[in-house]
Amino acid sequence: MQLDPASGWCQGVRVCRSPNFNARPSGEISLLVIHNISLPPAQFATGKVQEFFQNRLDVTEHPYFAGIADLRVSAHFLIERDGTVTQFVSCLERAWHAGVSSFEGRETCNDFSVGIELEGTDDLPFEDAQYQALTTLTRQLQSTFTAITAQRICGHSDIAPGRKTDPGPAFDWARYRAALAKAALEQEEQR
């Protein structure tokens, strides 16, 4: 996969455009937010996340859907259990993933962040393929948006404490950070 800095779209990933975005205010993209999602909860590979982000979810298909029927949300990316990456919104646009949020005293994280959803739940381990895809995608983002340092990668729970819990305790931050460090070192050695 390759992120095109001019368009904010990744080449080599699935594209499923969401209408749930708007223009970013001026300023640097400097934060990466990791989330998890599954629709219905704890059910995978249903295609319902894609429908949800496109406002096409049939709310009569599952009782859970009635509670989210009026939400208009998106993320820039979704990484499915098998590692498939789908992009919904250009990284240059503001996806609606963070909601009421704050990072280091700065409110409204959607203004300056990229959001990645991992297909999963707080309590089920994520798949090797997801960690691999997340690492590759993160390195692409860091190459384009250099202000997204390791210290500026967080979970939704970090920017919306008490309101959000994802990516949850099943997400292995140490594994992810070690993979990022290794990928960065390998990238430096190739230069």
Describe each model-derived feature in a short phrase.
Residues 1-107:
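N-terminal catalytic cores of peptidoglycan-degrading enzymes
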Residues 1-9, 107, 112, 121-191:
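Basic/polar, cationic surfaces and motifs that engage anionic cell-wall
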Residues 34, 116, 134:
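Conserved, mostly hydrophobic/aromatic
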Residues 36-37, 118, 157:
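Residues immediately flanking
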